């Protein structure tokens, strides 16, 4: 079925209240927020909602919604300026999952590694192929932070090594490490859906017997790894730096990403006390920080 959406501009101070009003008083099925000025996003701390100074609020309605009623409610709301601008659009229904599947293609990272959708044939059967169905979890290889980590893993000697994937998401890094020769990988994530997606993808790739998955509260307390990867965000990388550093064996390696270039210098200071850091590698405003624990 088709849908109708209304988009109007708001500020960080009133965007959430307008979204609540659209949902509670006008019958919107959802309310979402978009950056109106394409400002870089800095992640919030846990429990905090971070919105842009200039925010678009989008309300989604079914095709039968009375948009005259919606507009009248908006015009009479104290949250809305008298001369507010808005845009109403009709959206044709799509099979979004199928459309996404059509646009997810095999991708090569480094010399040996390919990430392939599970429903497509691997282009190089003799290469190191990871078959991926990310489900609801983050990590397909298309984001610069994921690709930077995959390329780094492809350049390491992982044969017989123990790896920790801190924030495993879809399991893409963990499974890539196993396909590249790692003996054992521990995947940790705060999201049960990510744990399930990692488990499913590990089974699909025939490596589930070598992948141990944990929520943070269940992870082993005395484990260290030869290689640790953490593709999360700058805030958690700062906050959890003592934990992440403690997971790296003496002589082991660490790669972290999810960091904007402009955050790299600051984030590096949280790790340079215990690791000899490599030059930062950047791509599309994001970067990878890696190093060696003496």
Curated annotation (Swiss-Prot):
Major subcellular site: cytoplasm
Single GO term (MF): protein-lysine N-methyltransferase activity
Catalytic reaction list: L-lysyl-[protein] + 3 S-adenosyl-L-methionine = N(6),N(6),N(6)-trimethyl-L-lysyl-[protein] + 3 S-adenosyl-L-homocysteine + 3 H(+)
One GO cellular component term: cytosol
Positions contributing to S-adenosyl-L-methionine binding: 146, 167, 189, 231
Localization per Swiss-Prot or TrEMBL: Cytoplasm
Gene Ontology biological process terms in this record: methylation
Enzyme Commission designation: 2.1.1.-
Key words, A-Z: Cytoplasm, Methyltransferase, S-adenosyl-L-methionine, Transferase
Enzyme class: transferase
Sequence similarity: Belongs to the methyltransferase superfamily. PrmA family.
Function field: Methylates ribosomal protein L11.
Designated name of the protein: Ribosomal protein L11 methyltransferase
Protein species of origin: Photobacterium profundum (strain SS9)
């Amino acid at each position: 079925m088709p849908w109708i959406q209304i988009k109007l501009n708001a500020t960080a101070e009133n965007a959430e209240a307008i979204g609540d009003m659209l949902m509670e008083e006008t019958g919107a099925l959802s309310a979402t927020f978009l950056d109106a000025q394409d400002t870089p996003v800095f992640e919030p701390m846990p429990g905090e909602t971070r919105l842009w100074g200039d925010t678009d609020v989008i309300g989604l309605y079914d095709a039968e919604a009375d948009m005259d009623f919606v507009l009248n409610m908006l015009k009479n709301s104290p949250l809305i300026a008298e001369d507010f601008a808005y845009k109403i659009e009709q959206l044709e229904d799509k099979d979004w999952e199928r459309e996404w599947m059509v646009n997810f293609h095999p991708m090569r990272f480094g010399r040996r590694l390919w990430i392939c959708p599970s429903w497509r044939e691997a282009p190089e059967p003799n290469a190191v192929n990871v078959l991926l169905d990310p489900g609801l979890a983050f990590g397909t290889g298309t984001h610069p932070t994921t690709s930077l980590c995959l390329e780094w893993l492809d350049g390491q000697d992982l044969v017989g090594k123990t790896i920790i994937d801190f924030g495993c998401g879809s399991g893409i890094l963990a499974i890539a490490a196993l396909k590249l020769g790692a003996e054992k990988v521990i995947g940790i994530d705060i999201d049960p859906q990510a744990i399930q997606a990692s488990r499913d993808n590990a089974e699909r790739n025939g490596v589930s017997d070598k992948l141990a998955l944990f929520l943070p509260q269940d992870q082993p307390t005395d484990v260290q790894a030869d290689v640790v990867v953490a593709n999360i965000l700058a805030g958690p990388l700062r906050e959890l730096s003592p934990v992440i550093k403690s997971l790296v064996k003496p002589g082991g390696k660490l790669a972290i990403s999810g960091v904007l270039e402009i955050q790299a210098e600051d984030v590096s200071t949280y790790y340079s006390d215990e690791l000899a850091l490599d030059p930062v590698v950047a791509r599309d405003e994001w970067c990878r920080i890696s190093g060696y624990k003496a």
